[in-house]
Amino acid sequence: MGITKTSPNTTILLKTFHNNSMSQDYHHHHHHNQHQGGIFNFSNGFDRSDSPNLTTQQKQEHQRVEMDEESSVAGGRIPVYESAGMLSEMFNFPGSSGGGRDLDLGQSFRSNRQLLEEQHQNIPAMNATDSATATAAAMQLFLMNPPPPQQPPSPSSTTSPRSHHNSSTLHMLLPSPSTNTTHHQNYTNHMSMHQLPHQHHQQISTWQSSPDHHHHHHNSQTEIGTVHVENSGGHGGQGLSLSLSSSLEAAAKAEEYRNIYYGANSSNASPHHQYNQFKTLLANSSQHHHQVLNQFRSSPAASSSSMAAVNILRNSRYTTAAQELLEEFCSVGRGFLKKNKLGNSSNPNTCGGDGGGSSPSSAGANKEHPPLSASDRIEHQRRKVKLLTMLEEVDRRYNHYCEQMQMVVNSFDIVMGHGAALPYTALAQKAMSRHFRCLKDAVAAQLKQSCELLGDKDAAGISSSGLTKGETPRLRLLEQSLRQNRAFHQMGMMEQEAWRPQRGLPERSVNILRAWLFEHFLHPYPSDADKHLLARQTGLSRNQVSNWFINARVRLWKPMVEEMYQQESKEREREEELEENEEDQETKNSNDDKSTKSNNNESNFTAVRTTSQTPTTTAPDASDADAAVATGHRLRSNINAYENDASSLLLPSSYSNAAAPAAVSDDLNSRYGGSDAFSAVATCQQSVGGFDDADMDGVNVIRFGTNPTGDVSLTLGLRHAGNMPDKDASFCVREFGGF
């Protein structure tokens, strides 16, 4: 079967051409190793190996070559390993059950010859052929992973394998002259083409374990680890890397991270330095910690899928725009530092623009050419004043923005808790600070150019100089500008063409002063600091500002205040007049109501007197009677006022209810036959039909009708006790038809 004999102490599995038998042996030993605590363990250290000296490495190289030749002669043929199962069998040797456990490989690391001698001592029953075959197999595996020699002719890499605290014979096959222990080893494969004819330049071998402990070479969902054999590029060697990952995707991600951040030129840097950088980058991602570290320590090589995607992204035409956009809004500090580095390396005058570039020429012009004319100097002076105003405005706007942002942060923190707004506002504040800084630098550069043209050397360093003895560059510049203006006005250096005589102050200055006046309308008295600031903003002197405010308070502010007071007094007078008119109207209305009431009472009284004096002998029709009853009902309140009068006994005072006429008519209809009867109301005070007042007592009752009784009773007045007349005193008229 191509499997060498094994002893109780050490088991060496060599797979030649049959995958089936080796998979069964792998399953057996893999199951045995799982009960012993896993295939192999890793410590938490990540140390670099100590490089041995040149003499020791040369001796070991000669020893390996000699033993390889002896094993090839003794064994007859060198066992050939297939790429599919070779690495999986390498890392599945069971621990020795006999004297092999007495070997403590973690305490001391021996050389190749010492390890092989101990191996031969632990296998006394092995014959010469088996021993030679085992030695050849051991050297074959050892040559696959040699220690890193330092001489230039050797094609070995820079990393070396180290042994671990494990009882497996894998460490016997992989000796190392170094002394320290580590985890996540990276093994390099440097076999020649005649030793491994079927070995490719880049191979990936995986060992897998399913829950039912059956080994599947291709269709398994649970992957224990990955082994990557990668080509290192121009060095001509191959690199072997180990990683503990759940799938090959994690290893591909780690390779992608390494290629993105460090590129193909990362082989020039030391692996230890790369590891430190990558460890700080992925400090919080504990899930991919082990697999990423292994992939990072491996030799740099471009993976097919990840590097293709990265190259597509890098070569895209949208990459530059996206990077600028991200640097503008996300990577604020890094972009600013990049620009500073580029400016310092390539062109130190990029920020200043034309100002920085023209400073030597302006200095040369000042030296070679005559100074500026008065008109040009005045123009540059105005420009300098405007730039100073802009600089002040930028500072004021930035302070205002910071205050507004702080208000928003405070309100958000009150609702969500302290520090809740920091992740959202910190980036915005940095971005806005960067914008304001760029704007301020541009204004400062233009101001520096103007100052250099004017010959103000002290003011040229306005953006860089600091506080000296209580004075600032702005105050010094202000003082110089005021001195120059005063000197120009006094000495008469200004030409008439450049400074035409004008009436009053400039309109821009007047607008600034007027705006300040209206902002402080309640107290238009600027302090000394306000006068200095206004003088700097308007380009005027302090005396001009003071005189303007004196005149403005007299000519503008005082008339406006007086006009406001006059308007208020007029409005008050109008309100008082309206109130008086309303009161007069109310009094007039009340008087009119009283007069109308008295007039109504008088008219009612006269009407009653006249009706009492005129006898009624005719009865109107039913409608006239109803109207008369209604008018009597309406005037009963007025008539009640005269109940105490002598004639009140003859007048009706009230009715039983509002429906009295209807009740009276119903009563008459029930008593006197309905349609044949009629009623009339008449008040008689004098004689009626030949009867005198003496014959009429109280209320006179007049009865008309065609009934057999022929009586119609009409009552005038109330039915008080003693107010009803006797039956004998009633006046009856019989046999009268309809009137």
Swiss-Prot record:
Cellular compartments annotated: Nucleus
Keyword line: DNA-binding, Homeobox, Nucleus, Transcription, Transcription regulation
InterPro entries recorded: HD (IPR001356), Homeodomain-like_sf (IPR009057), KN_HD (IPR008422), POX_dom (IPR006563), TALE_homeobox (IPR050224)
Compositionally skewed regions (Low complexity) per UniProt: 179-190, 597-627
Signal sequence, start to end: none
Keyword presence, DNA-binding: yes
Gene Ontology MF annotations: DNA-binding transcription factor activity; transcription cis-regulatory region binding
A Pfam family: Homeobox_KN
Extent of Polar residues compositional bias: 41-58
Annotated spans, BELL domain: 376-447
Region (SR/KY domain): 316-332
GO terms (BP aspect): leaf morphogenesis; mucilage pectin metabolic process
Chain segments carrying region Disordered: 23-73, 143-222, 341-378, 567-627
Top-rank taxon: Eukaryota
GO CC annotation: nucleus
Biased composition (Acidic residues): 576-585
Extent of Pro residues compositional bias: 145-155
Binding partners and assembly: May form heterodimeric complexes with TALE/KNOX proteins STM, KNAT1/BP, KNAT2 and KNAT5. Interacts with OFP1, OFP2, OFP4 and OFP5. Interacts with KNATM, isoform KNATM-B.
Swiss-Prot/TrEMBL domain comment: The SR/KY and BELL domains are responsive for the interaction between the TALE/BELL proteins and the TALE/KNOX proteins.
Protein known as: BEL1-like homeodomain protein 2
Source organism: Arabidopsis thaliana (Mouse-ear cress)
